[in-house]
Amino acid sequence: MKKFMLKGTSVLLAVIVSAGLTLFGIAEAWAQQKQKISYKLPAELSKFTQQHVIDVGDVPGHQVRIFEVHRTYPKDLLVVDGVRVVEEWLRGYSDYIDTNGPAWGYGIYSLENGDKIFTRLHGTSQAIVHPDGSKKNTFTGVITLAGGTGKFRGILGTLRTMVIFDPKAGVIEGQWEGEYWIEK
């Protein structure tokens, strides 16, 4: 009986050590693959290409809007896993009362090598009216990297964004930061 318990204990110890080393190796490899992203995009590189606004009619200023944004990226502004991002198309919709409320969307980053990265966006916009009557619209949200093509098929990640925008003037500028990893 004593001999059996020693064998059982040895086997159990070997299994625990193996599992621990395996989990440590997986966690270490996963952590090594995470890459940081941080960039700012000035207003002249983004524009609303389409906007369709419908008044809801329940309260003044309540509108639903479908929009499309095109962004161009100059050399070396945004590089993902060694490949330069050339442009981005974002298509989304918002549910605003006087430019306050939620917005959602879907985006595609096009890379220099022809690959694409797909994104989902959600967040909230807030309009602040200054004493002089001028207005500042700020969108704060989260972008989820949700796969892609070619080299970026397994890309995942999260970016936080803050964007200043004026849908009437077509102006958009902002900053993005977060991290991504590519699952094999």
Label each PLM-derived region with a short phrase.
Residues 1-8:
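N-terminal secretory signal peptides that target proteins for export/translocation
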Residues 11-25:
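Bacterial N-terminal signal peptides
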Residues 27-184:
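Beta-strand-enriched cores of mature, soluble protein domains
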